[in-house]
């Protein structure tokens, strides 16, 4: 039987909508049950305090969970499943939208794809002349602090898809989104390579921990 603490977030959601729940209540809704001597709301609150945010929580590995009394493999798998479900939702949504509706939508998608990755991943969104999404691909993966990018492969894929424009993105697992000299250099190389085939580079976004940098917003593209 559900306890009162487990019912409260559920009832609030049914009454006022899912957006009305706080981070603690939303987490409690997924955890469903607490641990011996600790109700689910208290457990959710302690977990968020430990990891700092939902981002920190969903990005954590199992070793970081071991210090929490009552949190075993089952709850860890459940939380990682939530993160993967969100990533796939945004991936499907991006494929099914007629066009990129806003920079905010693009950012949300990229954060869902790259947040929490332990290695640098370089992702490219390929667009047609009306900026409809043709495909998004993780073209390159690297180490904790570096990813090798080959501009010709980006152009080759764009030609194959008949793309008119691309959006570049990669993550910084360190959490700091500020671009390095190497990031700026490879962006320039990709732009020059794309220009030969009349393909526009609309932006290069770097995704950090709760922050991002847009080359277009800074006037670098």
UniProtKB/Swiss-Prot annotation:
Residues 99-221 form the MPN domain. Pfam families: RadC, UPF0758_N. A motif (JAMM motif) lies at residues 170-183. Zn(2+) binds at residues 170, 172, 183. InterPro entries: MPN, RadC_JAB, RuvA_2-like, UPF0758, UPF0758_CS, UPF0758_N, UPF0758_YicR. Gene3D superfamilies: Cytidine Deaminase, domain 2. Keywords: Hydrolase, Metal-binding, Metalloprotease, Protease, Zinc. GO terms for molecular function: metal ion binding; metallopeptidase activity. One of its GO terms (biological process) is proteolysis. Belongs to the UPF0758 family. YicR subfamily. This is UPF0758 protein YicR. The lineage of its organism: Bacteria, Pseudomonadati, Pseudomonadota, Gammaproteobacteria, Enterobacterales.
